[in-house]
């Protein structure tokens, strides 16, 4: 038997098996019947590799060996289970190359080693994207994402405009502690003028001069993930005015408020504001805010507290970023339509489908159908099946004539031939989405449940003037 153990030691070293413990744990050897002691395991001080015919924690149990014609008995190298961390022991007649007994351990996700004794460090594979910080856990990992990203691997971007500038957020959703009145009350700098890049003589919100604790508030109408804010000043009577610094508060009911604080402290965060009246300045929230109401409290102002702004973020579920109509990521050839209108029947005034991009500028800046009927459609080919969670629509003007789609349906397909119309789950019929009421304001609709498809069609159902459309699709390219 001594010669057999010595031979095992020699062969084991040449094959690269785990080294035997040299400390007090394995010296003297606690394994009986020629068992080999292994130390350095995750959840036990040592483990015994038992020779054929023996089993148990110390190789003290005799195994009943079956003949070639018989099926193995219930006793064997897998009783008791030598595998750690929930590993499954399987009897193996094949020579495995790293041990001398007839079994292998099938390890659960997150563990490896001969006996599943090692916790895998998943962070070594760098699963967290977009600057996320990985923390290794037992058989798992977690990603701490920057404010503008979310998802298990920080794979979803969450920094789109929430609609102050575009008009998705209505006037009624923007309120303030006070309003400045000038020129004997003829000029009123209302809170709903606080829209980023707003033009005109009165183009921002200004707090009243006697307002000692001014604030402006946005009601998002539902709980959303807010990851940042863009601020901008304005000129009033030729004089630059802007907010140099501010604080942020948030609430879910509009009554109980919490101040945004420096991460890991009880100190209220003071955000840097603007340095002139026109240049936008952005701040991100890490961690992000999850709330329905957001308030901005000016701290230091130049002359008067004057503001234009936009909130950034996404729906709580994420996956609500623009898919590329406005940015051009969706290319011209991917956008097609049922028909096209030409003003004065001139090619230079052709309202092609490729022009149906949100906020497109120019004299011919949208898609207009050649016919005004409910058989018209605008189609976007996303090239691969994509999760679509929302849509933004906008009208346009044709030589001063206001035109827009007042309502529409959505259809989707994966092959471009067989189509399904998105259904209203409660009423069990085709969903009719509310469209626009003018030529310029953005109108956003959430698609719930989301559509998962390659092709999307907008089916105009009612319209003003001619069927005219600019649009953006919202969603994400993957679902992990």
Swiss-Prot record:
Top-level taxon of origin: Eukaryota
Domain EGF-like: 24-60, 74-117, 119-155
Family annotation (Gene3D superfamilies): Galactose-binding domain-like (2.60.120.260), Laminin (2.10.25.10)
GO CC terms: extracellular region
Tissue: Expressed in angioblasts and early endothelial cells. By embryonic day 13.5, also expressed in a restricted group of non-endothelial cells including chondrocytes and retinal neurons.
Span of the signal peptide: 1-23
Intrachain disulfide bonds: 26-37, 31-48, 50-59, 78-89, 83-105, 107-116, 123-134, 128-143, 145-154, 158-314, 301-305, 319-476
Pfam family, one: EGF
Span(s) of short sequence motif Cell attachment site: 96-98
Glycosylation positions in this chain: 73, 88, 140
Record SMART domains: EGF (SM00181), EGF_CA (SM00179), FA58C (SM00231)
Cellular localisation: Secreted
PROSITE patterns per record: ASX_HYDROXYL, EGF_1, EGF_2, EGF_3, EGF_CA, FA58C_1, FA58C_2, FA58C_3
Keyword Repeat belongs to the record: yes
Annotated positions binding Ca(2+): 119-120, 122, 136-137
MF term (GO), any: calcium ion binding
Keywords from the named record: Calcium, Cell adhesion, Developmental protein, Disulfide bond, EGF-like domain, Glycoprotein, Metal-binding, Repeat, Secreted, Signal
GO biological process: cell adhesion; positive regulation of cell-substrate adhesion
Annotated SUPFAM superfamilies: EGF/Laminin, Galactose-binding domain-like
Domain F5/8 type C: 158-314, 319-476
Keyword Thylakoid found: no
Domain notes: EGF2 and EGF3 form a rigid rod via an interdomain calcium ion binding site, while the long linker between EGF1 and EGF2 lends considerable flexibility to EGF1.
Job of this protein: Promotes adhesion of endothelial cells through interaction with the alpha-v/beta-3 integrin receptor. Inhibits formation of vascular-like structures. May be involved in regulation of vascular morphogenesis of remodeling in embryonic development.
Name by which UniProt lists this protein: EGF-like repeat and discoidin I-like domain-containing protein 3
Annotated source species: Mus musculus
Gene that encodes the chain: Edil3
């Amino acid at each position: 038997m001594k010669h057999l153990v010595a031979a095992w030691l020699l062969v084991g070293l040449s094959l690269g098996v785990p080294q035997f413990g040299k400390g007090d744990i394995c010296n003297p050897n606690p394994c009986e019947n020629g068992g080999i002691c292994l130390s350095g395991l995750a959840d036990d001080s040592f483990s015994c590799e038992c020779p054929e015919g023996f089993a148990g924690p110390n190789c003290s149990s005799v195994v009943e060996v079956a003949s070639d014609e018989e099926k193995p008995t219930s006793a064997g190298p897998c009783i008791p289970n030598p595998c750690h961390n929930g590993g499954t022991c399987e009897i193996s007649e094949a020579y495995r190359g790293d041990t001398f007994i007839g079994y292998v351990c099938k390890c659960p996700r997150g563990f490896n080693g001969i006996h599943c004794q090692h916790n895998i460090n998943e962070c070594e594979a760098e699963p967290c994207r977009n600057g996320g910080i990985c923390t290794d856990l037992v058989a798992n990992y977690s990603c701490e994402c920057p404010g503008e990203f979310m998802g298990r691997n920080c794979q979803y971007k969450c920094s789109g405009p929430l609609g102050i500038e575009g008009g998705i957020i209505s006037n009624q959703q923007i309120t303030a502690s006070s309003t400045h009145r000038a020129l004997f009350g003829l000029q009123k700098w209302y809170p709903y003028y606080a829209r980023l890049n707003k033009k005109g003589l009165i183009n921002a919100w200004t707090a009243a001069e006697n307002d000692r604790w001014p604030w402006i508030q946005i009601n998002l109408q539902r709980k959303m993930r807010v990851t940042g804010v863009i601020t901008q000043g304005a000129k009033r009577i030729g004089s630059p005015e802007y907010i140099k610094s501010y604080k942020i508060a948030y609430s879910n009911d509009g009554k109980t408020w919490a101040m945004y604080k420096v991460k890991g402290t009880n100190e209220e965060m003071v955000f840097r504001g603007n340095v002139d009246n026109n240049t936008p300045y952005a701040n991100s929230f890490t961690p992000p805010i999850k709330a329905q109401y957001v308030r901005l409290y000016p701290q230091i102002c130049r002359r008067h507290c004057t503001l234009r702004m936009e909130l950034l973020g996404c729906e709580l579920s994420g996956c609500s970023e623009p898919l590329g109509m406005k940015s051009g990521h969706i290319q011209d050839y991917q956008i097609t339509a049922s028909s096209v209108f030409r003003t004065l029947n001139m090619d230079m005034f052709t309202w092609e489908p490729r022009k149906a991009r949100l906020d497109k500028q120019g004299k011919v800046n949208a898609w207009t159908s050649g016919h005004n009927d409910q058989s018209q459609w605008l189609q976007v080919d996303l090239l691969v099946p994509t999760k679509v969670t929302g849509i933004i629509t906008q009208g346009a003007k044709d030589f001063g004539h206001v035109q827009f789609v007042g309502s529409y349906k959505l259809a989707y397909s994966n092959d471009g031939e067989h189509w399904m119309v998105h259904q209203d789950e409660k009423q069990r019929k085709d969903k009719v989405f509310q469209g626009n009421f003018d030529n310029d304001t953005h109108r956003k609709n959430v698609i719930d449940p989301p559509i998962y498809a390659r092709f999307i069609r907008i089916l105009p159902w009612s319209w003003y003037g001619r069927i005219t459309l600019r649009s953006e699709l919202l969603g994400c390219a993957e679902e992990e």
